[in-house]
Amino acid sequence: TYRDKKNDKILRDMFDYVIVSTGHFSVPFIPEYPGMKAFPGRIMHSHDFRDAEEFRGKNVVVLGSSYSAEDVALQCHKYGAKSVTIGYRHNPMGFKWPDGMKEVFYLDRLEGNKAIFRDGHVQETDAVILCTGYLHHFPFLSEDLKLKTGNRLYPPKLYKGVIWQNNHKLIYLGMQ
């Protein structure tokens, strides 16, 4: 069932299968940390990261431990960031980082221009870049048809990563 806005009509069509192929890289996941609202520097999501030149000469904190975090952190370093501190939540990426880069355990809070990590590390920072993934967002589906899962490489209840186990005629592509 859908609305034809041009003709202001409600229409209903029947299909054997429905494929949801909208992907999930449009609504960034923005975690909340104490002190974020009062942080005097820049906070952005990797979704909006365009040019590492902006961070030349600055202390940058990158939060995340997957491909985007690695890419953003290395770009910031390459383009002259004063320091790059990567905060991970579960496991460090574990690379031998160049001088001026390090990994530390989980951001606890921001206090002024300082990032305080759970392992006790304190880092002055000018910018925080969130490489924290994306939310699944399906505003066009009714609640009973929406895939409800956190940001995961292999969402549960998707057989072979595509066929929804709650309704085998609903196929999700690009959710990983």
Feature-to-residue mapping (PLM):
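Flavin (primarily FAD) cofactor-binding/catalytic cores of flavoenzymes
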Residues: 1-176
